[in-house]
């Protein structure tokens, strides 16, 4: 409601501890065929609007993991140390399991593509790209359930301060990513 996702198909994602994606389905409580949940988006005296809901369990918590490992001092340092390319380093940020659409609490994170040339900048880039990839996968699931592509994504939350993450998100989605103040 706060990001003005009033039309059917409007989508938003909050990048906090996790990443939480919602897409307006209008006045119809649409049931997902692909592992998403259905929620009430808002209710007024005049109407009830519904949304599809999907989650990525580890977003800012994956960044906190980088600080716990001593690879960055804080989330604010990410963009300053990130490498221009991951050089093949890949990260699946399932540090707390996988949420929608897999629902696998037993899933573990995966880091691959490391070499002696890998730096902390490559690891930071891989974590950010891994978060963006999970959100992009969710958007594909949303589009399948909605029967139409989602044309833009409105975002908020602490991680939206990372220009690198937001650019990775836009690149993977190939739609505008509109950052709302957090």
Please give the residue ranges for each predicted region.
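Active-site core segments that coordinate phosphate-bearing ligands/cofactors
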Residues: 1-182
């Amino acid at each position: 409601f706060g990001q003005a996702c009033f039309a059917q198909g409007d989508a938003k994602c909050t990048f906090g501890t996790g990443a939480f994606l919602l897409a307006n389905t209008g006045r119809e409580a649409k049931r997902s065929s692909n592992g998403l949940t259905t929620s009430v988006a808002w209710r007024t005296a005049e109407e009830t609007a519904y949304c599809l809901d999907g989650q990525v369990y580890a977003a800012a918590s994956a960044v906190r993991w980088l600080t716990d490992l001593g690879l960055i001092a804080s989330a604010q340092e990410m963009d300053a140390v990130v490498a221009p390319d991951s050089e093949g380093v890949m990260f699946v940020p399932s540090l707390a399991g996988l949420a929608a659409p897999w629902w696998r609490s037993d899933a573990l994170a995966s880091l691959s593509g490391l070499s002696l040339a890998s730096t902390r900048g490559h690891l930071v880039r891989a974590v950010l790209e891994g978060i963006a990839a999970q959100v992009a996968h969710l958007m594909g699931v949303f589009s399948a359930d909605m029967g139409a592509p989602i044309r833009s994504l409105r975002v908020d939350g602490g991680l939206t301060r990372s220009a690198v993450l937001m650019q990775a998100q836009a690149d993977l989605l190939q739609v505008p990513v509109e950052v709302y103040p957090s």
